[in-house]
A protein has these predicted regions:
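Glycine-rich beta-to-alpha transition loops that act as phosphate-gripper elements at the mouths
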Residues: 102-109
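Small-residue-centered hinge/linker elements
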Residues: 1-98, 110-168
Length: 168
């Protein structure tokens, strides 16, 4: 005897039982987005558009869904991947005319927060770390102090921009 998948069972009941008799329990597909955004391997999973596109499309394809829920737990990572995931969520939400509700677990920072901003509503615990979109590079300039002390520094690179954040 063949075993039926959850999707096959759901489709069967949709065909056999009229919608008005099915109970009225709202369907809200959930997509979990966890980890660093960007490059991933089997041993180090991460969030990339190629890794989550099918999950998002599947969540937005539920026939009677009232909304799509995203669970975000990410410190951020690649700005490009963050934006691609954000954009795909908004495209699907607009196309399917479904609201997106985002739940931030422990952290939704940097690119994780950017993805969360694709939601129509963001919910989190009071202890969750939320916010901070942007790339920051901090450095100090000691060139005058080094010159006064007579220190000479030599750096050899294959291009000028490779040391543009060098504080010396």
């Amino acid at each position: 005897m063949a075993e039926l998948s959850g999707e096959q069972v759901r489709r069967f009941f949709e065909k056999v039982i009229p919608a008005r008799l099915r109970g009225g329990v709202p369907i809200v597909p959930v997509v979990r987005l966890t980890g660093v955004i960007g490059f991933s391997t089997p041993l180090r999973p991460g969030i990339t558009i190629s890794g989550v596109a099918r999950l998002l499309e599947r969540a937005f394809s539920y026939k009677h869904a009232k909304a799509v829920a995203l669970i975000v737990n990410s410190p951020g990572g690649s700005p490009v991947q963050s934006h691609l995931v954000y954009r795909r969520i908004r495209q699907l939400a607009d196309e399917k005319k479904l609201p997106v509700i985002v739940f931030i677990e422990d952290v939704g920072a940097s690119g994780g927060y950017m993805i969360a901003c694709a939601g129509d509503e963001i919910l989190c615990d009071v202890s969750s770390i939320v916010g901070s979109i942007g790339v920051v590079g901090a450095t100090f300039g000691f060139d005058k102090a080094i010159g006064k002390l007579g220190i000479e520094r030599r750096v050899y690179t294959s291009g000028k921009r490779k040391v543009m954040l060098d504080p010396f």
